[in-house]
Amino acid sequence: MSELLSFALFLASVLIYAWKAGRNTWWFAATLTVLGLFVVLNITLFASDYFTGDGINDAVLYTLTNSLTGAGVSKYILPGIGIVLGLTAVFGALGWILRHRRHHPHHFGYSLLALLLALGSVDASPAFRQITELVKSQSRDGDPDFAAYYKEPSKTIPDPKLNLVYIYGESLERTYFDNEAFPDLTPELGALKNEGLDFSHTQQLPGTDYTIAGMVASQCGIPLFAPFEGNASASVSSFFPQNICLGDILKNSGYQNYFVQGANLRFAGKDVFLKSHGFDHLYGSEELKSVVADPHYRNDWGFYDDTVLDEAWKKFEELSRSGQRFSLFTLTVDTHHPDGFISRTCNRKKYDFDGKPNQSFSAVSCSQENIAAFINKIKASPWFKDTVIVVSSDHLAMNNTAWKYLNKQDRNNLFFVIRGDKPQQETLAVKRNTMDNGATVLDILGGDNYLGLGRSSLSGQSMSEIFLNIKEKTLAWKPDIIRLWKFPKEMKEFTIDQQKNMIAFSGSHFRLPLLLRVSDKRVEPLPESEYSAPLRFQLADFAPRDNFVWVDRCYKMAQLWAPELALSTDWCVSQGQLGGQQIVQHVDKTTWQGKTAFKDTVIDMARYKGNVDTLKIVDNDIRYKADSFIFNVAGAPEEVKQFSGISRPESWGRWSNAQLGDEVKIEYKHPLPKKFDLVITAKAYGNNASRPIPVRVGNEEQTLVLGNEVTTTTLHFDNPTDADTLVIVPPEPVSTNEGNILGHSPRKLGIGMVEIKVVEREG
């Protein structure tokens, strides 16, 4: 209803101003601005819903102030360009319509009415209301009834008898199991679901809508609200340190807790969360690569589901034979948006919908087959009678190629339980949410029937039943949940540990690099993660007078305030205000002590603008003073005009990447010397080793041969044509995820460059 009202007000404002208001520059600008805001809000809502399926939520608010990088982002470049072009066209058309009768005399009454209607359209729009609610949730003090509903369970289970296998299916929501909507999509796992306790109405709440958030909700009974963006949790040293979670209770009760997944454990801080709450045995892509049958059989995120579940089965056998009480948690990945991945061992490799193949549905059908095979192995084993198997989605599916079909259904998360000790076959339609999962499992294992805000769906009453407005209630509790982190409110002294790459202050520890906004009553950490903008881009969003402490590699801040450190990859500390004074200190000791020192200076807006503009320079446009191209820092020497075919800086240098260009091209601002030596320090990747690598300058070509280890080679060039471009052609770029950012498409690596130097020869 509010959508129709807001659109009607918008339309009325446009028509009244266009036909009655007449000509007045101020009223035209004001009305166009407000109507334009209405358009931007609704496009933001549309785009947000495209990604989240839940409108403008916490994840979107974070993205609006940072940048979205990570898995599958390239899939959305064209839609993003389309939105920008559409927005430009709408603004142009709106301006033309409003100026329709610009030659008529101005009418104050109609102008005021049009502006009020425009303001009303913004106020009535769902997008404005969602953003308003989110902003309020950032500044509330909390809800006084939080303490009444948040309950800590007993720290142990008396006389535990059952082992636990808990399977998180990535985005594997219950909606996929609707056989009428999606015939024969999940036959194997669907049959197992129907044999157990199937909870059919598990809703998704704010703060539970991505993987680490879903894990926290299901194991701790609280949403993941933090004083920083949730996926940046890899930077913290402990995770809700004061809370009692399911893993803590299991460990205290004599369980050995295991977690197995195909992706890197550091992503989104899963390793920190699990280690903080009772898990001593963790296996991710790094830990599995030395034990799996084929370490090269991987997708963009890590190992495929068939590999991961095979390792989980081996671990289940080993632990069951030992007689030790255990829990085994595993997380799949093949159903990750936007398209998913197909394991090579499954029979269900293709699923057609609407008369054509659908990659996301195909990935679901394949993954559920692998999960079902794993469960059936357990059921066929002699240890099943002592085992409880739980299958749940970590969250609802995000925007994938099946998403528009899912949205036509009543969407719920998956949660079902198969008991080996006491088979039960029942579908329970009780209203519940992800936070109830841990309490329900705890109840089955013989513990309490509550865990944080979660309640057992077998013997308790879910918050989803108690509160009809549970989503709004959850947001109202957000400040209370953030306070559970016990995060410090001041920062006066800090310590940097170079061996551990950590910073400590006021009892808290964070991994480096780190940016902090420091005020009188609050310290806001802004870590760097796969889904966040680089810290310098985040700093560029600070207000002129915001106090900051920025700990990062020296070269990243050198172009602003310490040019002498432009080639240093050591740690540096910068602090101050973007519109005031800044200092840069080189961290020159293994354990380095620092103090915050913010001076109350006059703000210089010209200085502020200059700092912001410099911070926003993209890596490839950065230039530094040097007589050679140093590849382990961002940018290039001042003599270089542009370059291509080169990947991002790493600690040792940079790889060539054929995804960015078949050749490495370095174009200089001026012609290269008539005679020069080209000194190349580099290595080769894979099959490029010991192969001739053409190196060209103008019409002259030399051959470079590299091994897998770094070596230095000098090539002699004559340049009679005054060529200004150096070209290196790796013979056989190899597609690989080695050293890649988690979730990104594979790079095609050829040579790894450490340094390239042009040395002019006499004569």
From Swiss-Prot:
<keyword id="KW-0808">Transferase</keyword>
<keyword id="KW-0472">Membrane</keyword>
<keyword id="KW-1133">Transmembrane helix</keyword>
<feature type="transmembrane region" description="Helical">
    <location>
        <begin position="77"/>
        <end position="97"/>
    </location>
</feature>
<feature type="transmembrane region" description="Helical">
    <location>
        <begin position="108"/>
        <end position="128"/>
    </location>
</feature>
<dbReference type="GO" id="GO:0009250">
    <property type="term" value="P:glucan biosynthetic process"/>
</dbReference>
<dbReference type="GO" id="GO:0008960">
    <property type="term" value="F:phosphatidylglycerol-membrane-oligosaccharide glycerophosphotransferase activity"/>
</dbReference>
<keyword id="KW-0997">Cell inner membrane</keyword>
<feature type="transmembrane region" description="Helical">
    <location>
        <begin position="26"/>
        <end position="46"/>
    </location>
</feature>
<keyword id="KW-0812">Transmembrane</keyword>
<protein>
    <recommendedName>
        <fullName>Phosphoglycerol transferase I</fullName>
        <ecNumber>2.7.8.20</ecNumber>
    </recommendedName>
</protein>
<dbReference type="Pfam" id="PF00884">
    <property type="entry name" value="Sulfatase"/>
</dbReference>
<comment type="similarity">
    <text>Belongs to the OpgB family.</text>
</comment>
<dbReference type="GO" id="GO:0005886">
    <property type="term" value="C:plasma membrane"/>
</dbReference>
<feature type="transmembrane region" description="Helical">
    <location>
        <begin position="1"/>
        <end position="21"/>
    </location>
</feature>
<dbReference type="InterPro" id="IPR050448">
    <property type="entry name" value="OpgB/LTA_synthase_biosynth"/>
</dbReference>
<dbReference type="InterPro" id="IPR054288">
    <property type="entry name" value="DUF7024"/>
</dbReference>
<dbReference type="InterPro" id="IPR000917">
    <property type="entry name" value="Sulfatase_N"/>
</dbReference>
<dbReference type="InterPro" id="IPR020881">
    <property type="entry name" value="OpgB"/>
</dbReference>
<comment type="function">
    <text>Transfers a phosphoglycerol residue from phosphatidylglycerol to the membrane-bound nascent glucan backbones.</text>
</comment>
<comment type="pathway">
    <text>Glycan metabolism; osmoregulated periplasmic glucan (OPG) biosynthesis.</text>
</comment>
<keyword id="KW-1003">Cell membrane</keyword>
<dbReference type="InterPro" id="IPR017850">
    <property type="entry name" value="Alkaline_phosphatase_core_sf"/>
</dbReference>
<dbReference type="Pfam" id="PF22895">
    <property type="entry name" value="DUF7024"/>
</dbReference>
